[in-house]
Structures are given as C-alpha cells and as structure tokens.
Amino acid sequence: MKEDTLNFEEELKQINICALGPLRMNNALIQSKALAEGAKLVTITSQAGSVEWRSTQNKDTGGDYGHHMSRAACNMAAKLLSEEVKGMGYSVLMLHPGFNKTEMTKKYEHIWEIEGAVDPSVGAKRVLYEVIKNGMDETGMFINCEDGLQIPW
C-alpha cells in the first residue's frame, strides 16, 4: 500500500453519498406511498462495485477504496431492497451507464477514446433504454447499459 493513499474521512463521505444516498432516496419514495403499481426504482451505479470486474479489468492496480467500496455497498443495498419490495409490486434495477466523459472521469481523459467513453447524453439514453426495457423479471439485476448484459458481482 502506498503511503498516505487512504483518507478515511473521504472514504466514509463516499460511502455516505454513493451507498446510502440512493438507499435514502428509494426509502423516501417508498415511504411517501406515491409510487404507482409496477414502479421501477433505479439506482445509477458503476461496474466499479463489481469485485469480479475489479479483479480482471484493473488487476494489480488497487486504490480508489472509497469509490469501489461505496459502489459495492450501493449494489448490495439495491439487491436487498429488490427482495424487500418485490411483494409490493416494485422492481429495482442497478444500472451502470457506461464510461462517460465527466468531471469525475477527467483523470482518465487520456484513455477516453481507447475505452469508448461517451458524452453523458449518450449514457443517459442508454439508461432510459434499460429502464424502459426491464421490469419485474430483471429486479435486482446489475446491468451494464453499454451492452445490456448483467454485470457479475
């Protein structure tokens, strides 16, 4: 481990925002009793929360603890929620919008073209497509909006 690579306050902040934030939002929607029958609760997440992806695509690089841990926790929260609300007639989807050209990914600007990074408007269209296409049969699935395939845990 490199010296001074961990900032525990920052790691906790990321977990609070990226893992608990979507859970808070979904909880508020459910508690409001304003959701229609068949409502879809969508969590925008990242393949960075996939342990399998992390051990293959970025093998031997480590780092970004807060980001990866917060996304894995976010995905687990959504999976648990999907089981809990299935009986209420709601589905829960976890969607990775793909590699988007944003301020958050700017540090990877040198590989945007190589890795196929897209404008966020393209990522948003991909997300909408998956939301429209998927429903109760896919509840609890972790889906890559780039190709529609399920992302392994």
What are the language-model segments listed below?
Residues 1-17, 23-24, 30-86:
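Catalytic loop of short-chain dehydrogenase/reductase
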Residues 21, 73, 119-123:
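Soluble or luminal CAZymes and related metallo-dependent hydrolases
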Residues 47-49, 98-102:
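Short connector loops/turns at beta-strand edges and beta->alpha or beta->beta junctions
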Residues 75-81, 85-100, 137-142:
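Conserved Rossmann-fold SDR core element
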Residues 94, 102, 106, 110-153:
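C-terminal helical subdomain
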